[in-house]
């Protein structure tokens, strides 16, 4: 991981892209931390919880930074729930439009919250969810 040049956020724009391997992700940690601080203040002022959506941003190399500010992770299945458990702190909320029966026990064990897509899903998986003391919800 390359460090920001001099720690000055203005230097990020001067980054020599030829120095970077390709492909790669380039993250301005200073800008990210500034945004996380805004979210943290919003949480304090409004008494809400904010979760990171791992489907959109699953960069586990900066999970410690993100976990200092956010309340947990929103996962879209078993593998994201495993990622959240291993690298991120806080609660794990898992949603899937179609949970697989052979994965649901493990998803329930990893997750604090399960969000279902239909009443049929609730009927199918309710007993397993309750066995692991998951809070449940339905997506509308």
Predicted regions located by residue number:
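N-terminal glycine-rich anion-binding loops that anchor highly charged ligand groups
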Residues: 7-12, 36-38, 44-57
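Glycine-rich phosphate-binding segment of PLP-dependent enzymes
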Residues: 13-19, 35, 62, 66
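An N-cap/entry alpha-helix motif that binds or orients negatively charged groups
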Residues: 19-41, 45
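Active-site-proximal beta-alpha core segment in soluble small-molecule metabolic enzymes
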Residues: 48-140
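Intrinsically disordered, low-complexity segments enriched in small/polar residues
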Residues: 4-5, 135
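Generic N-terminal amphipathic, Lys/Arg-enriched alpha-helix
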Residues: 5-26
